[in-house]
Amino acid sequence: MKKKILFLIPNLAHGGAERVLINLVNNLDKSKYDVTVQTLFDVGVNRKYLTSDVRYIAGFRYQFRGNSHFQKLFSPCFIYNNLVKENYDIIVSYLEGISARIISGCHNPQTKKVAWIHTGMTTEKIASCGFRSLSEAQLCYSAYNMVVSVSTDVRNNFLKYFHDINTCVLYNTNETEQIMRKAEENPGVTPFFNSQFCVCSVGKLIPVKGFDRLLNVHKRLIDEGLTHTVYILGIGEEEKSLRQKIREYGLEDSFILLGFRDNPYQYVSRCDLYVCSSRREGFSTAVTEALIVGTPVVSTDCSGARELLGEHDEYGLVVENSEEGIYQGMKRMLSDPGTLAHYRSMAAERGKDFSKEKTVRAVEDMLDSL
């Protein structure tokens, strides 16, 4: 008999966690599992990528401002009972915070509960986000049969704040074959075919991604005569302020916001360098995908970076998590063709480790062990 599994996530927007959830549920063995994805809000560009054998449910049609504060007015049990209308063998909160609080409200002893943690909980504020307090977060996470972290760093940070909880590390699922196929498509953007050194980064235009730092570093390098073009793929709340600063710097032709693209891989694969300027990550999906397509990487030293790129920079450059660190890493790659060529070959080698089959099998083994 198939196990009924529910995955709960706030929405299916254009983020890394949302994308890897789609990859995972689409590839779970449907002869073993009856899979449902439920969002709190019926929004997000990733919904269309769910395969027909994955059921989709939305709690609310629209997302409203202040929802994270509003839900704290009610107990997890009250919200769960009003939101989840069926019984499941396993229910999964696929994102820390709100969904983790809600799923903890399931008191059916026959239902196993799993929480996924995608971010490095480096402060008490981050650890308690979505909960009334850190003590409530401890109580909620203690209700889970398993808490999954997407990297060892994420797990270690989680355990600094939460105790006596079963945890494990499972890497994200990437559609490696599909990524490689899409990387071959023609982006139709002329600058990718000239001799200019191209740098790219992918992510929501939000403060945690550090694109403001990347812009400052770009200006500094341009002023030093290190010519290159930066392409950012993504949308978000910082777009207006970034565009204003780009105009102030007079860099409209060399720091380009391309917006959201269904196929970022055709851009990333054609760039000379991928830069992760994030202030905080869990296990960067975008960096993983850059490695899969063989693009050299410079990443700030945030959670998961060394697991991806090596403790001693074997597969890419891990730099100090600061503007100066990003500057030093980019300058080295721009100035030293030998280093760049070395990391191009090492990126392709590391990318082979992220096979879809391996990561899906690890998740299925965890689900079957509950």
Where on the chain are the PLM-derived regions?
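N-terminal strand-loop element at the rim of the active site
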Residues: 7-15, 19-23, 27-70, 154, ...
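Short His-centered aromatic/hydrophobic patch
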Residues: 93-99, 117
